[in-house]
Amino acid sequence: MCFSFGINSEAQNLNQVLWDDEPLSSSIDYNSLESLINNPNGDDFNFTISNKRRIKGFGINIFLDTYNIKKDFDLNTVPEFEFEITSKNGIVEPRNRYIKSDHGFYNFYVGQGINRFETDESYSTVILPIAFIHKNANCVHNGILIFSIEENNISNGILQISSETCAYLKFDLIAVLDMENQLIESLNKETHLSTLENEIKSFTNLYNQYDIEPGSFAELPYFFGNSDHVTISGLIDGSNHYSNNCFTRSGFYPLCNELLLPSYSLAKSIAGTITIALIQEKYKNITSESVSIIRECRAPSWVNVTLEDLSDMASGHYLKSKFDYDENSLVHAAFIFEALTHDEKIEIACNSFPKRKNPGKKFVYRTSDTYILGTGINEFIKERDMGDDYFNDVLIPFFDELELSSSIQYSLRTFDTKSQAYTGWGMYLIRDDLKKLSTFLQKVKINNDSLSFLHEALNPNKANSNVAIRSADIFYNNGFWSRRFDGYKFGCKDDVWIPFMSGFGGITFAFFPNQMSYYYFSDEYIYSWEDAVYAAHQIRPFC
């Protein structure tokens, strides 16, 4: 059975589809699910669910495939899944969020969902946020899985993908799944904080209160007139979190707080910089550790390169110094997409980019250097009995202290027993993680008593930063970008430096001098957030 795409003008009764009383005629209008979300909580349960039986109906519309991925992989299928879910007080929590799949291209993600009784019915309906995530890249295709439960019986499932943060592959997909479930007698006692009801405020309040131009914070649909390429944007001001609804091609995403966001190169600042700062609290010399701690990087050209040089993108090794030449080179594409094992990745990273200058002087952006950094951090902590995997042994305990979500506690890794975390890309977040990271980073920014490596990254200046893009006054230091603005534009005596994280396709997470933080996730290669800078200054001056 094939389906058409486009929001229904008259919403179909999904319950008829879920219980096999009629076929699905077209895609789901997400806005039609809003009334269900406000219904009473469904009964508690603990199930294992799967889709290992036949697919009853399927439709896909691929409207962007830059690299012709459909030629090499079958995109006309749904990844098989099997996972345990627990429903308590209407909140549905998966035991594991990341599900490995036999699909050639995707793994499967499931987030925290809801369980609500249908009006005047004996069954409840479950909506789970799901995503297809690329096995060897950071793209995310977001959607929902919806099904009903009556006593211990499960209905069909409807899986729909209607949005993504992915610059080179975009599609709409819908499938009716023949679902199975198995009752687990005892409820899973593991509990997680719910992010579903975290309070989010509208940008409209800010615009009205401070007479700010609508659209200044890149919220939909103002972002350069094209909302299709913006996943989400937000402004964080202490306990206040302003954001937009999560736009999709099928209406607003019904569980916006649980929408999965890819880190791309935000991981360089999180997995790279924060990890070094945490280790440095105990071992001050980590930043000066030679890259030769790594067996594959013991060539004479690497001897004087330190872990800090790698974090600065200043190893002195490169093909050409032209911005993004190395990052977009064929050999680096092979490192990212074709090298699947650690041995393959580290071989390319250490031996494909010749020494051109002494380390510490010249900025040349290349993700493979951050992969070397992650490998070096692992070797450093092994020698000091701190563990053997920095992501699991250093970073995840830190995430737990901040009460970040389970979504951020995962990284893409090499396909071998080494299972090396990619470090420079391959993490995931939800909106609440951004708020908690903002609170932490803004505190470190103004406090120089600890985490000095991170504090320096958040306080850029001419002395500690290398020029990255001279024409745009953009600099780089310790895994963070920064942009210098003329102080007179804000009535400030000195220039204003704004540190930020940046990710492939159009992702920014910036930290303003007035203790506000701003973010947007998009995939149209737009890196422009000056309006947000001036609007934030209008709310609370930078100096």
Predicted regions and their residues:
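Long, solvent-exposed N-terminal ectodomains/accessory regions
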Residues: F5-I149
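Active-site helix/loop module of the DD-peptidase/beta-lactamase fold
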Residues: N13-I37, N41, F45, E281-Y318, ...
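Low-complexity, highly charged intrinsically disordered N-terminal segments
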Residues: A175-S227
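Active-site-adjacent helix/loop patches that line small-molecule binding or acyl-intermediate pockets
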Residues: N208-S233, P300-L404, L429-K435, T439-K443
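A short, well-structured edge-of-sheet supersecondary motif
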Residues: Y210-L255, T508-F511, S517
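Active-site SXXK
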Residues: P262-I286, L310, L373-I377, L434-L441
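Carbohydrate-binding/catalytic loop surfaces
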Residues: E327-F337, L412-Y428, Y476-N477, W481-F485
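Active-site Gly/Thr loop motif
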Residues: S405-R413, N459-S522, Y527
